[in-house]
């Protein structure tokens, strides 16, 4: 994935996987939805997708073996159906599982919610996993990029935003940073985004609350965009991707690029 072209990344929110409380007993249902959503993103003109076990709430800090195995199978099958890059995000913060899946299915990037520092979340206290991820990357070298949140949503943070960002890059090894609002679907603080763009030595990606209106506002301050909630039917996170909505926002991005 080319982070120099301001990529538009669509989120495939997976239905509850085996091992999670909400699993319905059908991997085929999960796979069919994932392939359908991914195909719509590609048809709409998105540059990449990211698979996320969003339906597995309440989340554990690390995932079970059955969840990891099913996630990997689904990611592999989705990859066979589309040609755009794929990313992996294992909630709540299982960066080792994310990288392991990405490595095995030849994905292009992963997202890590808490790479460095500490976050106080609805799952309890989550500590950064930079060391574990760095060791795994050393054992399994690849071109997989690490996109890491700074002051991730659904969490309280006590370090300053500036310190957290610089630590995420300089000590955590992030290839890009992600800035979000306070919750899924919440718009980012433009002042925070502007600060991130000013001080970050790596690309800055907007990771929540995007729509065709505000993506124009954020364009000059961001190097990429992750879209999930707005492109769903009715703007509801757990619904299927709306091809019409996905196409609308993709057309805005292409217009801003001058394509």
Swiss-Prot record:
Q: Which InterPro entries match?
A: BtpA, RibuloseP-bd_barrel
Pfam families for the chain = BtpA
Report the PANTHER family cross-referenced here.
SGC REGION PROTEIN SGCQ-RELATED, ZGC:162297
Family from the record = Belongs to the BtpA family.
Q: What is this protein called?
A: Uncharacterized protein PYRAB10620
């Amino acid at each position: 994935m080319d982070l120099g072209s301001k990529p538009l990344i669509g989120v495939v929110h997976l239905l509850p996987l085996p091992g999670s409380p909400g699993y319905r007993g059908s991997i085929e249902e999960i796979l069919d939805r994932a392939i359908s959503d991914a195909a719509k993103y590609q048809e709409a003109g998105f540059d990449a997708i990211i698979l996320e076990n969003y339906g597995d709430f309440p989340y554990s800090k690390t995932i079970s073996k059955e969840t990891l195995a099913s996630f990997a199978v689904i990611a592999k099958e989705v990859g066979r159906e589309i040609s755009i890059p794929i990313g992996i995000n294992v909630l709540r913060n299982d960066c080792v599982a994310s990288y392991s899946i990405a490595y095995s299915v030849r994905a292009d990037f992963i997202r890590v919610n808490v790479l460095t520092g500490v976050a106080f979340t609805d799952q309890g206290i989550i500590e950064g996993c930079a060391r574990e991820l760095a060791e795994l990357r050393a054992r399994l070298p690849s071109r997989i990029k690490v996109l890491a949140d700074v002051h991730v949503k659904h969490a309280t943070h006590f370090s300053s935003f500036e310190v957290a960002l610089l630590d995420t890059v300089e000590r955590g090894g992030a290839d890009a940073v992600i800035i979000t609002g306070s919750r899924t679907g919440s718009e980012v603080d433009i002042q925070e985004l502007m600060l991130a763009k000013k001080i970050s030595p790596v690309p800055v990606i907007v990771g929540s609350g995007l729509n065709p209106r505000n993506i124009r506002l954020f364009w000059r301050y961001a190097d990429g965009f992750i879209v999930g909630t707005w492109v769903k039917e009715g703007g509801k996170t757990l619904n299927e991707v709306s091809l019409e909505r996905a196409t609308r926002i993709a057309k805005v991005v292409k217009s801003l690029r001058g394509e």
